[in-house]
Amino acid sequence: MFRVLLRSLFALVVAAVAVLIGWRVLRPAEVLATVKPPFPTAPPVFPHVTGRIPLAPLFVDDRVRVYAAKRQIRADAPPNSDTVRTAIWSFRRWPEQVSGVVAAGRTVISRWSDGDLVAIAGDTGKIVWRAQGPSASGYAGHRTGSATVWAPENLRVAGPSVLVTAGGQISAYEVSTGTRRWTSPTACDNGFTTAGGQVVCPSGAVEVATGSAVASFPAGPYTPVGCDVASSGCAGLRDAAGHGWLTSGATPVRAAALDRPDATVAAGLVFYPSGNSLRSVDPVTGVVRHDYPAAQVLGVSAGRVVLLTADRTLLAIDARSGQTVLRYPMTFLGEKLTWDPGRWQVTDRFVAVERLAKNRPDDPDTPGYYFSVDAVILAEL
């Protein structure tokens, strides 16, 4: 009898220990590691390809690179490193997942599946503020994380505000403090923000500063053009009728040259394919400015328009004079140039492009979807 009791007691102790270990492992937890001085600064640059890495970096103030994984965001520096470096700061949460990451100035704002918004100083790794918002979808960044840091779902920035959409409404939070500025009962799934300070939803636009509806705005739904990462700061749009508009000011300006479905806007000019060339024209009058080699417009860097040609040559042009100010092939250590561009980011100093295989499967999680293990190529501008 004594042995039976002893065995039962031992079994209870083992079970209790297992429960304790399981609770300690699986309980909700957060881990924050901050930067040890000296804090990162923006390095000097000269135009060339710097390296290739397996993850999509979000360049923050051209000082650090931020990466997203399922349950963690982390940063490395300097931003022109040819490989992913040891993290200078990191923030991990369990069991929540990273839904999206954006940056405004030096502040990195992450949105998590439980609805938490967490703002971290990009150069120190310290939490600046946090706010509770509506729950969000889980991690959808696949292998590189590009969808999470360059195209997050329902997370946008505009000036001093970060905007969150969920449950048929949109809310604006102050980037510096996390204070909720306003909430509008406007369905805005995957809307976009304009360079002129509006957030554009399928049914119309609201002012980022106040949350009030914009009285005079073309009818939607809309197609954004000339946007930065996170579908933010868009320089133009096409309305439901396919008419083009410039959106860099307080009021949209009609731009007939932007009516073409293959046209975009950069540095105040409209660009579209013309035969074997890329043509720039005045957005309002349509007067031709310059022709360039056939290329895709990636964005604007310190006033220069950045292009990627079909043979994967990177160009930066002065849109006013038409002069090419830099040119080099987007290859590292003799890699082939047989890849398709996926997503990308252009800043004043850097460009990063996700490279996809030419004959790839539809599923990003299927082997052979990306061009190589180090799918993202980096360059200085």
Residue ranges and their predicted role:
Residues 2-381:
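Secretory-pathway ectodomains
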